Amino acid sequence: FFIKPNLMQLHSSYVVTDPKGSIAVECGKLMLRNGYKVKIFNSINFKKSHHYNPFAYIHSEKDILKLVTTLIANTKGDGKSGDDFWQKAETLLYTALIGYIHYEAPEEEQNFATLIEFINAMEVREDDETFENNVDLAFKELASREPNHFAVRQYKKYKLAAGKTAKSINISCGARLAPFDIQELREITMYDELELDTLGDRKTALFLIMSDTDSTFNFLISMIYSQLFNLLCEKADDVYGGRLP
């Protein structure tokens, strides 16, 4: 009784949390007919969803830190005691790996699937501190070219951890990223169609469909909102003088 009458006024862009997707069905065609771009992220049925890639909104080192903060805030670790230490350690590793992916990987590989491949390749041998896995070698090569590279600096801090501790950090990261390791989620985050950073530029309706009985993938909706608010606030301040058109 409240949402649909507001949507039907068609006076601005909208972001709608839409349990079960009924609002998108009832209002989507009207909005399309009136010149709106309509975007749908469907966490109930990924096959009926636009793609969402959080990596698509990274343009600077600051954006990398924001994405890592968003990831940590909206996902679950493995519940280790001393969570603050493990979160900080995870943050270092995510920052290093995402920095490497953003600056060194081809655009089509800048996504969570690649991040998971990196984590999976990070073998640690507790009895051999000199062992170097493929990720170590990749960062070693990058450091030889650009010793002050942002990702290299973060990775060196992570590598201060002893073998057993590093292994635990990797396990914590793997636990947090476990949902991204299912095929459907890898696919839906492979590239981006939501264009969150353009929401304030022209009339757009973004429907975020989520289950009201199963919270498994609600963290994706939370990540979208976190990135959306950051992106639009920055654009309002930097481009439009404090207010979106």
Region spans (language model):
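P-loop NTPase motor domains
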Residues: 1-245
